[in-house]
Amino acid sequence: MLSHRNLIANAFHYMTTVPQREDDLMLVMAPLFHAAGSNGVIANIWTLGTQVTLAAFDPKIALDLIQTHDITESLGVPTMLAAIAEEQHARPRKTDSLKLLVHGGSPIATEVLRRTHTAFPAAELVEVYGATELSPICTILTNEQE
């Protein structure tokens, strides 16, 4: 069982590597019933950021929300990043507000990283690794470290 202290410590660990700001707008693509989705928003809540959630993942809707709300950050699994990158290449939207794309949950292919970076050149790609019993994040790799 995870304690509140575990979750807060994990959010603090995340924020020391990936600074959060009050004016951040996070698109939550990961399901909130999963550790990535629920714990992924704690740092954003802590810093008084705003979350926009998807009822179900759809790359077209995700990109429309990024454009409409000037989303600054998002998180998801590599297949989600691949899907939004391909949709952005096929039907570009204004996404220059997007400064951070966090991914984890499974390995990410080099080609997916490349396509995502070319689709969202203003966004830093950050990889997280963890497990639910770790509260959940234990390793964070920024652009520089990848």
Question: Regions from the language model: what does each represent?
Answer:
Residues 58, 79-81, 108:
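Alpha-helix capping/helix-boundary segments
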